[in-house]
Regions:
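Glycine-rich, often proline-containing surface loops adjacent to acidic residues and nearby aromatics
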Residues: 19-23, 59-72, 99-104, 136-138, ...
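N-terminal auxiliary "cap/dimerization" subdomain that precedes the catalytic jelly-roll/cupin core
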Residues: 1-92, 211, 283-303
Length: 303
């Protein structure tokens, strides 16, 4: 695994590097700075008069779940959020017509002892592909406030193309969509199926700490984990994902070595240029026909 900063290459070469297991950090995108400013202002307004990084000292977990459960869907489905994400993707060199993206997800990581379930779930060792992500998925992760090695996330470079025992066989994307309707109510106990590595103890871990205004790109095959937050500060980040259409059609992708889940998240991805979803006939050809009663795409109440 290599860590590549601001590579001067095409979007196609960026994807090739990511499919090979490398990590890429982009540091000079004006659209990214605009997105960070926009998100930070929302968090400051949401928690006023408290500082977002210290808000857990003043608000209990149940009230925090209520506040975030109301704000996160508004942020995710905001036209401004989507517009800013599209601008980031295009400024990074990914052609709009052949790139699909999913909606930006704000993540919150509170210090241990506070809210770590539901809307603030702390992810164990996992690959996004265990959550029915396509093999062509590229993750884009950016902090909103400064992060540290004791509240960020960690990678296991040695396991990128090596099978790891995991629980992804119990995960079905369509059933998970239905269970997400109660995510904001999960305050003390996690109720959703969350695929994870089983008793995973990597020999080495790699922690990447981009600054606000920088963004980390990595393949959905990368094995990574939310570091238990012992910093005393709340961590706020946003992530979204992209899929390249020619890569999807040709099968060019990162390796799938241990994926056992069912269903597919591909319908969540919208074209950067015109907002269209993948054609259902194509999805069925690539991934098979879904059950007749499946919730193919999650729809948040009042989104």
């Amino acid at each position: 695994m290599n860590i590549i900063i601001d590579p001067k290459v095409s979007g196609e070469e960026l994807r090739r590097q990511l499919y090979a297991g490398n990590l890429i950090i982009l540091t000079h995108l004006r659209a990214l700075e605009n997105f960070v400013d926009y998100t930070r202002e929302q968090l400051i307004d949401l928690f006023r008069p408290y500082e977002p990084e210290h808000v857990h000292e003043h608000i209990d977990p149940a009230e925090m779940a209520r506040i975030l459960g109301g704000w996160k869907p508004r942020f995710i489905h905001s036209d401004t959020s989507k517009k800013l994400v599209r601008e980031i993707i295009q400024e990074a060199g990914f052609p709009a017509e052949q790139t699909h993206y999913d909606l930006p997800k704000p993540r919150t990581s509170f210090p241990q002892g506070h809210l770590t379930t539901g809307v603030a779930f702390a992810f164990p060792w996992h690959r996004d592909t265990w959550y029915s992500a396509p093999a062509q998925q590229i993750n884009w992760w950016l902090p909103i406030f400064p992060v540290r090695e004791d509240n960020a996330m960690s990678f296991d470079p040695a396991s990128f193309a090596r099978a790891v025992p995991n629980s992804s066989g119990a995960f079905d994307y369509y059933r998970n969509n239905a269970s997400r309707l109660t995510t904001a109510q999960q305050v003390t106990r996690e109720q959703q199926a969350r695929p994870a590595a089983l008793s995973h103890q990597p020999e080495q871990q790699l922690v990447i700490i981009p600054a606000p205004g920088q963004i980390l790109l990595f393949s959905g095959t990368q094995l990574h984990v939310s570091i238990p937050n012992t910093s005393g500060l709340a961590r706020y980040s946003v992530d979204f994902r992209t899929v390249d259409v020619p890569d999807l059609l040709s099968g060019r992708a990162a390796p799938l070595v241990d994926v056992q889940c069912t269903g597919t998240a591909i319908r969540d991805f919208l074209n950067v240029a015109d907002g269209s979803a993948f054609d259902e006939e194509l999805v069925t050809k690539l991934y098979g026909a879904p059950p007749s009663d499946a919730m193919l795409v999650f729809e948040a109440p009042n989104a």
